[in-house]
From Swiss-Prot:
GO terms for molecular function: ATP binding; UDP-N-acetylmuramate-L-alanine ligase activity. This is UDP-N-acetylmuramate--L-alanine ligase. InterPro entries: Mur-like_cat_sf (IPR036565), Mur_ligase_C (IPR004101), Mur_ligase_C_dom_sf (IPR036615), Mur_ligase_cen (IPR013221), Mur_ligase_N (IPR000713), MurCDEF_pg_biosynth (IPR050061), UDP-N-AcMur_Ala_ligase_MurC (IPR005758). Its main location: cytoplasm. It is found in: Cytoplasm. ATP binds at residues 112-118. It comes from Desulfosudis oleivorans (strain DSM 6200 / JCM 39069 / Hxd3). The keyword Nucleotide-binding applies. SUPFAM superfamilies: MurCD N-terminal domain (SSF51984), MurD-like peptide ligases, catalytic domain (SSF53623), MurD-like peptide ligases, peptide-binding domain (SSF53244). NCBIfam families: murC. Belongs to the MurCDEF family. PANTHER family: UDP-N-ACETYLMURAMATE--L-ALANINE LIGASE (PTHR43445:SF3), UDP-N-ACETYLMURAMATE--L-ALANINE LIGASE-RELATED (PTHR43445).
Length: 457
C-alpha cells in the first residue's frame, strides 16, 4: 500500500471483521489505533501486537490518523467520524481497506448468506496443509490459532466477504466462492432479486483468468448459473454438479461422504466438524484445492484434522451431564441447519435451546420464518432482541417471537427477560444427558458460560 497512509484508525476496532484487518496491518508494519465501547480479548490481543485502543468514542482519539476505517454498524453521526470529516481525513468502509490488502496477493474470497466463516476456515486449512502458507482474514476465531487473521508468506490471501451493505462489490477476487443466496440483510436490499443481482455483479468482477465456485443446491444461486460470464465450477449434492458429495453418513460424531469430481470418485472424507450443512462448505474447499492443483490426499487430511471456528457448533464444555454448545446462527436457515447438525452429532439427546434474536429489522423481515425454525429442539428459551445498534420497532420483540413459535405448535417455549432469568430457568429444567445450545449473533454465549461456571447473574 501507498505508505503516505501509514497511520490507520478503526472505529469499532473490537468487531470480529474490523479486528482481523487491524491485526494484518499491524503485522505488516502499519501504525494502528482505534476505539471500541468495551475492552475484550480481541482488543487486548491488538494492544499486545502494538495497537493503541481507546474505550469510548471521542473525536480527539483520531489525532495523527491518515485514514479512518468504519464498518456498516457505525452511525454516520459518530463523533470520531464527524471529527475525521471536519479534519479532511478520508473515511472509508471496512471493505475498501480489505480490498487494498487483497490487491497484495492472489485473492480467494468467500461470499454467501450462510456458511462463509466455516467455508473460509476450510479453504484456509486446505491451503495451509498444501504448504501454501496463506494470509487469512475471517469472520470468526480459528480454534487452532485463537485469532481471526493470519499473515502468511505465500502468494494467496483467503478472505470472507460481507454482502450486508453491498461493499463486497469492491473486491475482484481471483477465485470467488458463493455458498448460497437467501433473504438476508433486508434492511439494505429490497428483496431477493436485488440480493441475487448483487451476487451476480460480484461474480462479474472476477478477472478473465479467475474462476467462480458456486453451490448448485441453492435455488437462487442455481438460477444465476446461466448468467455467469466467467469460468465456473459447481458443487453440491446434485448429480448435475461438477463436484459432488455422495453417500453422506454420520459416523462417530463426524460426517463421512464420498467426493466425486466430474464422474470420477476421488475418495472419502470424514469431516472434522459436525453437520450435514458443513459437507457443502467442505466441497467448496475441495473445489478450491483442486483448482490450485493440490492432491486430494492433501485436501482430505486438511478437512479431517481441522479444529473449526469458535461459535460454529462449538462445544464449550460439560457440567452435570449437560453438554453446552454455542453457535452464531441467527437466520432461520442457519438455525434449522444448526439444529439438524446437533441432532446428527448427538443423537437421542434432549436439545434445549437459548435463542437471542439479532436486530429488530431482521426479526421483523423474517418473523414468519423464525416461528417455524425451531421444531427440532425440545425446549426453547427466547431472550429479548439484541439490538446491534438498531432502534426498537413497535410490535417486534423477543416475547412476540416466542408467542409466534408457540402459535405454530411448539409446546416447549419460554420467554425470559434477560440473562439472570434465563440461567435460573435453565437450572430448573436441564437434565443429565441434555444438550444446551446457545444460538445468536449477540452475547447469548455468556449464558452457556454461566451455566458451566454454576453462576447466576
Amino acid at each position: 500500500m501507498y505508505l503516505k497512509a501509514y497511520h490507520i484508525y478503526f472505529v469499532g476496532i473490537g468487531g470480529i471483521g474490523m479486528s482481523g484487518i487491524a491485526e494484518l496491518l499491524l503485522n505488516l508494519g502499519y501504525t494502528v489505533s482505534g476505539s471500541d465501547i468495551r475492552q475484550s480479548d480481541i482488543t487486548d490481543r491488538l494492544t499486545g501486537l502494538g495497537g493503541k485502543i481507546f474505550y469510548g468514542h471521542d473525536g480527539k482519539n483520531i489525532g495523527g490518523a491518515d485514514v479512518v476505517v468504519v464498518s456498516s454498524a457505525i452511525a454516520a453521526d459518530n463523533p470520531e467520524v464527524a471529527a475525521a470529516r471536519e479534519a479532511g481525513i478520508p473515511v472509508i468502509p471496512r471493505a475498501e481497506m480489505l480490498a487494498e490488502i487483497l490487491r497484495l496477493k492472489y485473492s480467494i474470497v468467500i461470499a454467501g448468506a450462510h456458511g462463509k466463516t466455516s467455508t473460509t476456515s476450510m479453504v484456509a486449512s486446505v491451503l495451509g496443509q498444501g504448504g501454501m502458507d496463506p494470509t487469512v482474514v475471517i469472520g470468526g476465531k480459528l480454534k487452532s490459532i485463537g485469532t481471526n487473521a493470519v499473515l502468511g508468506h505465500g502468494d494467496y490471501i483467503v478472505a470472507e466477504a460481507d454482502e450486508s451493505d453491498g461493499s463486497f462489490l469492491k473486491f475482484s477476487p481471483s477465485i470467488a466462492v458463493v455458498t448460497n443466496i437467501d433473504r438476508e440483510h433486508l434492511d439494505f436490499y429490497p428483496d431477493l432479486a436485488a440480493i441475487s443481482k448483487s451476487f451476480l455483479e460480484f461474480l462479474d468482477r472476477i478477472p478473465f483468468y479467475g474462476v467462480a465456485v458456486v453451490c448448485l443446491d441453492n435455488e437462487p444461486l442455481q438460477a444465476l448459473v446461466p448468467l455467469i460470464k466467467k469460468r465456473f465450477i459447481t458443487y453440491g449434492t446434485s448429480n448435475q454438479a461438477d463436484l459432488q458429495a455422495r453417500h453422506i453418513t454420520p459416523i462417530n460424531g463426524k460426517v463421512r461422504f464420498s467426493v466425486v469430481w466430474r464422474q470420477e470418485e476421488l475418495g472419502t472424507i470424514d469431516l472434522g466438524v459436525p453437520g450435514f450443512h458443513n459437507v457443502r462448505n467442505a466441497l467448496a474447499a475441495v473445489a478450491v484445492g483442486l483448482e490450485l492443483g493440490l492432491a486430494f490426499a492433501v485436501i482430505k487430511e486438511a478437512l479431517e484434522t481441522m479444529a473449526g471456528v469458535q461459535r460454529r457448533l462449538e462445544k464449550k464444555g460439560e457440567t452435570g451431564g449437560v453438554i453446552v454448545v454455542d453457535d452464531y446462527g441467527h437466520h432461520p436457515t442457519e438455525i434449522k441447519a444448526t439444529l439438524q447438525g446437533v441432532r446428527q452429532h448427538w443423537e437421542d439427546r434432549r436439545v434445549v435451546v437459548v435463542f437471542q434474536p439479532h436486530r429488530y429489522s431482521r426479526t421483523k423481515a423474517l418473523f414468519d420464518d423464525f416461528t417455524r425454525a425451531f421444531y427440532q429442539c425440545d425446549e426453547l428459551v427466547v431472550l429479548p432482541i439484541y439490538a446491534a445498534g438498531e432502534h426498537p420497532i413497535d410490535g417486534v420483540d423477543g416475547e412476540s417471537v416466542a408467542e409466534g413459535i408457540r402459535a405454530h405448535g411448539h409446546k416447549g417455549v419460554r420467554y425470559v427477560e434477560g440473562r439472570a432469568e434465563a440461567v435460573a430457568y435453565l437450572k430448573e429444567i436441564l437434565q443429565k444427558g441434555d444438550i444446551l445450545l446457545t444460538l445468536g449473533a449477540g452475547d447469548v454465549w455468556r449464558i452457556g458460560e454461566d451455566v458451566l461456571s454454576g453462576q447466576e447473574r
